[in-house]
Amino acid sequence: MSNLEYLEYSAKEPMTLLRKKFNNGEDIYKTSPTTLTAEDASADVMYLKYVFENAYSGFSYYDKSLFDTAFAAIVKSLKDSVQITPDQLIDVICSNLSFITDGHLALTTADYGNGFYKELQTYVSDMPVYKVRDAYYDAKTKKQVLFDDAVRTFPTLNNSIADSYLIGIRSKNPTEKISVKSDGKDEVLPLHRIMSKEQTEESLVEERYEENTAIITCSSFVGDSEEAMKKLYEIGKKCRKYRHVVWDLSNNLGGNSEFPKHFLKGLYGDVADTVKVLELQSSLVHAKETGEIKDIPYHFEESPHTPTKNGDLFTGELHIIINDMVASSTELALRWAASYPRVTFYGCNSLGIGHFGDLCIYYLPNSQIVLWCPQKVFDAGIQETVGFEPDFWIDSYDVVSTVLNHISTK
């Protein structure tokens, strides 16, 4: 295909229609062939290269030669194939482009997918410690504990001991143990992945109220219902009268950032959206968004920041619960919330997906593989794969109860 043919093909199914289907829960996948010829697979790869170069917001963050080398290697490897399945094609592409770190960018079919993300997991031991000046002590034996720089301490809540910590490590590879010195002797501590709330049925909002505390749970922000946004605003407004508001965002992978923004507007009166957002503009992005072919030079435009001041109508304390299934626009909400006074975060690290976002859907012509392609850059200060770290790390499946117990002691 020529560049014009690529544009015309991409414009046939604009995001104005696909986004509506996705938000309504409709299936956006097409039937993929069982196998592809090497020629058809190579044609898909060349279309993918065109999309990367003209519509992927993360493309300019890497050296172009890396992409050129990777795509040349993919095409060369396909020449040795008589037939290849769509799933195999996905894996060949992802393995050659493994230098990319992007949790949104992905290639999928209806029953298979692969991407460009490897989470920095948190592993902790069962040994709680506390800190006195610059030294750490075992909370049970009271003996001093020494460890090297690879081992981290994670502030936690302990109603009986101040300045308490979990000890462990953050790693992209499974880690089963760490070595420490306790009372001058070497000791090996088993590690486990930090506990977090188990997945439950997704819902936009659930609310309950206990004396001076409001508990608001939002496990999904998918959709675009103005009525639902208004509901979140009214719930936020209702919460102003409470001394404590617990906002449980566990397992919320994101969706539409207007949902959390409406809750915060209701609670505080306004949200200072100071996160810098860069929108990629190009002929391909325009064609995919609108279905219109138009010559637009490749460039980034910064979205305007309005308003520039947070509201102050809530005078209580906001307690936000997060875990390693919090991502994308929900992480954006964490950055907004962190700009208010008297806000504390509990749980564990967020997923760290969202630096590149606002997804467009592209179909590779022959395989019908779906490319989920970010077209914006969100500079929220949350590093991809690292995530947002809480003020207090809670090794529990029920962080809400831990936080409520903590609040009751205030």
How should each PLM-predicted stretch be described?
Residues P307-I321:
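Short, conserved helix/loop micro-motifs enriched in His/Cys and acidic residues
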Residues T217-F221, D248-N252, L278-S282, I321-M325, ...:
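Active-site-proximal beta-strand/loop segments in catalytic clefts of secreted hydrolases
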Residues M1-V245, L249-L253, E258, H262-K265, ...:
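Flexible, low-complexity junctional segments that flank or bridge functional domains
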Residues N96, L318, V326-P341:
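Cysteine-centered nucleophilic/redox motifs
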Residues K237-E302, A338:
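Glycine- and acidic-residue-enriched helix-capping/beta->alpha junction motif
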Residues F67-V75, K79, K309-N310, G387-K410:
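Extracytoplasmic/peripheral linker and loop segments enriched in polar/acidic and small residues
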Residues H104-L105, A327, Y340-H355:
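Short, well-structured beta-strand/strand-turn elements
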Residues F345-V400:
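BRCT (BRCA1 C-terminal) domain core and associated BRCT-interaction motifs
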